[in-house]
Structures are given as C-alpha cells and as structure tokens.
A protein has these predicted regions:
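Active-site pocket-lining segment
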Residues: 34-37, 73, 81, 151-220
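Condensing-enzyme catalytic core mediating Claisen C-C bond formation in acyl metabolism
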Residues: 20, 99-165, 169, 176-177, ...
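Flexible glycine-/small-residue-enriched beta->alpha junction loops
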Residues: 1-38
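A glycine- and small-aliphatic-rich helix-loop capping segment at beta-alpha/alpha-beta transitions
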Residues: 1-14, 137, 204-209, 264-277
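N-terminal extracellular/periplasmic Venus flytrap/periplasmic-binding protein-like
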Residues: 49-141, 146, 204-211
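Cysteine-centered functional microenvironments
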Residues: 39-46, 51-53, 112-124, 154, ...
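Internal helix-turn-beta structural module
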Residues: 182, 199, 203-204, 208-212, ...
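Active-site-proximal alpha-helical scaffold in enzymes
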Residues: 1-2, 40-69, 131-137, 202, ...
C-alpha cells in the first residue's frame, strides 16, 4: 500500500501487487509470458512441443514425489487453524491427472494466437529455501558436512524481451570458467519458467533431456520467485549424491534479462568425511 508511511488526510490509497513487477520484466519490458511467446517464435517451438514438455515435467515430478526423492531436502511444516493442525509434507502443485488432451484444450494466456498457456508455464506458488554457504575451512571448523563445492558461477544479461534465453550464455561462461564442457555434466537443472523458455535453451545448448530436470521443474513443482534458485541447486546436489555422480550444472533466467549459472561438484559421503578431517 503506497503512501501509508506518512499521514494521508484525503484521497484514496492504491494497493499494488508486488508480484506484478516480477511478472512484467521489472517495468522495462513486456509481460513474462510475452517473452516466452517471443522465444517460441524465434526458435520455432510449437504448442505441441510445449505441452509435451509440460506433461513430461509433471510425470517426472509426480514420480519423484512418490519415490520420496524430495524428503531429504524438504522440511515438513505445521499449518494450524482453529479446528485442526495439518502437517504439510509434500508439494501440492504436481498434477497426476495431467494429460496431453487436457493441456491441448487450454487457451493461450498472453495473446490471442499464442502458444503459452497456464498448463505449459510454471506455477505461481509460495516457498522458502535456504542453504549454508561457507568456505571449506569454516565448514571443517564447525563440523558441518560438505555436500558439494562451487566450481564456478556466471551471470549475464540479454535483451529483456527474450529474457528466458539468459541461461544459455551464462552456462557457456560458467563452463569456460570451470574448464569443463557440457558433456562433463552428469545432471543439469534449467528452471522451467515456461516450456517455450526451457525448450529454447535446450535447442541453443543442445541439452540432453535424459539428464536434465530429471525430477521435474518449474512447470510441475512451481516457480516461487526468490526461492527457485536455491531449490534447483539443492535438488541437483541430492540427485548427484543419490546417483553417485560428480558434476552438475544449474541455471535460471530472471526478469529484466539476467541469466545465472553455477557449476557444482557433489562430494560423496566418503569424500565428505575425508574433507571434514583434513
């Protein structure tokens, strides 16, 4: 609510939706959905391709939830009301009933002849996330397990009207700094802000979908602004540890045209113990 810090004697109060800034490219460009439409046109991504990707995301997320893959990285929350207390232990967003038929019936959300719909875009939901980021020396001093180490990071900027392609150059830059190739990555997380946005990045980077977003992403798990970056990094670390893999790559786009990427090395239990006693 604007103008309430100081006394306002006459006139109306305007209530502003702060989320809208995040959905309109920080006021300097088109709505986020239009940027996805722009990428769909530029990279010739069809509605069918977007819906198929959305369905795959839902299927992967539902399978991961059923297999308990997120339990290690999530904290149950008690929600109290007057009548009862509910323990929330799993995400409510993944849709087991998702189907291509249902997805194909949805109307375009951002322009009349568009291809971006509520079904092939990320969900707006609430979440919080956190990690402990420390030097190896400090982690050893505190006796903390070292799950992974950051090898490199990179942040770049692209034109706001195609903001979703930001991860591409960020990935290339982060890999170069790390002295590694995309082929060296054993798990990849590229947030699905929109199916069109992810597919544009997939085409530009020639991503291997078999190792990318293997447990779902923004379309199926939701995209809580401000928490997604930590979420995809944490999920990737636990997936690398489960599968006894080493290198991972995570990247995300951001309103205004930023793209950020990080290359990580997961440390298996024996490596964690070795480092904690160095």
């Amino acid at each position: 609510v604007e103008g309430v810090r100081w006394e306002k004697k006459l006139g109306n109060f305007d209530i502003r939706d702060s989320m809208w800034d995040s959905l309109t490219n920080l006021g300097i460009g088109p709505a986020m959905g239009i940027t996805a439409e722009n990428l769909a046109e530029r990279y010739q991504i069809s509605r069918k391709e977007q819906d198929e990707l959305a369905l795959l995301s839902q299927q992967r997320a539902c399978r991961a939830v059923d297999e308990g893959k997120f339990k290690e990285e999530t904290v149950p929350i008690e929600v109290k009301s007057r009548k009862k207390t509910v323990l929330v232990e799993r995400d409510e967003y993944p849709r087991k009933d998702a189907s291509l038929e249902a997805l194909s019936k949805l109307s375009a959300s951002f322009k009349e002849d568009g291809t971006v719909t509520a079904g092939n875009a990320s969900g707006m939901n609430d979440a919080s996330s956190g990690v402990i980021l420390a030097s190896e020396e400090k982690a050893r001093e505190l006796g903390l397990p070292i799950l992974a180490r950051i090898i490199s990071t990179a942040t770049v900027g692209v034109e706001p009207d195609i903001m979703g392609i930001g991860p591409v150059e960020a990935v290339n830059k982060a890999l170069k700094k790390a002295g590694l190739r995309l082929e060296d990555m054993e798990r990849v997380e590229i947030n699905e802000a929109f199916a069109a946005q992810y597919l544009a990045c997939e085409k530009a980077l020639n991503l291997n979908r078999e190792i990318t977003n293997v447990n779902g992403s923004g379309i199926s798990l939701g995209h809580p602004v401000g928490a997604t970056g930590t979420r995809i990094i944490t999920s990737m670390i636990y997936e690398l540890l489960r599968e006894r893999k080493r290198y991972g790559l995570a990247a995300i786009c951001a309103g205004g045209g930023m793209g950020t990427a990080m290359v990580l090395e997961a440390l298996q239990k024996e490596e964690q113990e070795e480092r904690s006693h160095v």
